């Protein structure tokens, strides 16, 4: 299970700390979802998702304001007796002194934001989904080509980094070389990024390590990119049948998500950068509803039907 420090969330969302007396350095968030404790304020604590970040909006605050003081204090103590990362008040709602006292007593940090409840929840969930996403690391190169994330794979020394360097010279952007960290942020989205230690570097055999950001400028690099297409480079095999039409897509699976994969045989004289660019544009065309292979198939079929009449 992956975790993210509460302090990182506070910094990212620019939250105001209403209980600075509480040390948050050891508090970890483990759940990407959030919870609005509406039913819990009425005293119903069955199925309470206390391990999530708790959000208080106008509705919850208005209900607490109408409670009798003793009853309200009892509900607050019961609520914060559960182990939770924190409670966030949205819309700039003022936190009562009674609420702060109970929070400090129970060790539950309280924060505040000026953002609306729904927009804050959406922003937090989206960020936590990425931070807490399941992940793997694979050997390869990830490049942004015309907005499509191209993951170049293949055996060591086959030319992945050289292909990436040529793509960079042609105006495309490097995400990571050699090691790709892949996160599954949804059932149809994979995000690739570089380890901090190797970010923006490329290794070229015979030359060594080069800093792409320094050599080609900030426009030549990118920190993250969705993985839309995989290109697997392999040595040319005369006995192997390679796809020449592209009517049927081949796929590779990462973390349960399937990604379109093209096996590209390597021979002297083949321009890998142009092949990668063509694959990216063709993939985008297919997403927009046009399939060149299907169009050719339809033309041939129609031509044969005409001749048979």
From Swiss-Prot:
Name of the protein this chain belongs to: HPr kinase/phosphorylase
Top enzyme category: transferase
Species this protein is from: Lachnoclostridium phytofermentans (strain ATCC 700394 / DSM 18823 / ISDg)
UniProt record, GO biological process: regulation of carbohydrate metabolic process
Summary of the function given for this chain in its UniProt record: Catalyzes the ATP- as well as the pyrophosphate-dependent phosphorylation of a specific serine residue in HPr, a phosphocarrier protein of the phosphoenolpyruvate-dependent sugar phosphotransferase system (PTS). HprK/P also catalyzes the pyrophosphate-producing, inorganic phosphate-dependent dephosphorylation (phosphorolysis) of seryl-phosphorylated HPr (P-Ser-HPr).
Domain of life: Bacteria
Assembly mode: Homohexamer.
Gene giving rise to this polypeptide: hprK
Further remark: Both phosphorylation and phosphorolysis are carried out by the same active site and suggest a common mechanism for both reactions.
Domain comment (free text): The Walker A ATP-binding motif also binds Pi and PPi.
Cofactor(s) essential for the protein: Mg(2+)
């Amino acid at each position: 299970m992956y975790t993210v420090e509460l302090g990182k969330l506070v910094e990212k969302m620019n939250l105001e700390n209403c209980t600075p007396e509480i040390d948050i350095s050891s508090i970890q968030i483990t759940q990407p979802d959030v919870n609005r404790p509406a039913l819990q304020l009425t005293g119903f604590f069955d199925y309470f998702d206390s391990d999530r970040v708790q959000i208080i909006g106008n509705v919850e605050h208005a209900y607490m304001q109408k409670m009798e003081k003793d009853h309200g204090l009892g509900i607050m103590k019961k609520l914060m007796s559960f182990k939770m990362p924190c409670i966030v008040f949205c819309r700039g709602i003022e936190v009562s002194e009674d609420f702060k006292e109970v929070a400090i007593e129970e060790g539950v940090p309280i924060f505040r934001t000026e953002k609306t409840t729904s927009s804050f929840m959406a922003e937090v969930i989206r960020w936590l989904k990425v931070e807490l996403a399941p992940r793997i690391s694979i050997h390869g190169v990830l490049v942004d080509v015309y907005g499509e994330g191209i993951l170049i794979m293949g055996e060591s020394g086959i030319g992945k980094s050289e292909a990436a360097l040529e793509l960079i010279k042609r105006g495309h952007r490097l995400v990571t070389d050699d090691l790709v960290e892949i996160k599954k942020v949804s059932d149809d989205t994979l995000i690739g990024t570089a380890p901090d230690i190797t970010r923006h570097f490329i290794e070229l055999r015979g030359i060594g390590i080069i800093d792409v950001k320094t050599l080609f400028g900030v426009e030549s690099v990118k920190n993250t990119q969705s993985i839309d297409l995989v290109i697997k480079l392999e040595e040319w095999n005369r006995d192997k049948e390679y796809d020449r039409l592209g009517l049927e897509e081949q796929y590779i699976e990462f973390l349960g998500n399937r990604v379109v994969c093209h096996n590209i045989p390597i021979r002297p004289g083949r321009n890998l950068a142009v092949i990668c660019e063509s694959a990216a544009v063709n993939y985008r065309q297919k997403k927009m509803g046009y399939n060149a292979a299907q169009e050719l198939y339809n033309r041939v079929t129609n031509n044969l039907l005409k001749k048979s009449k």
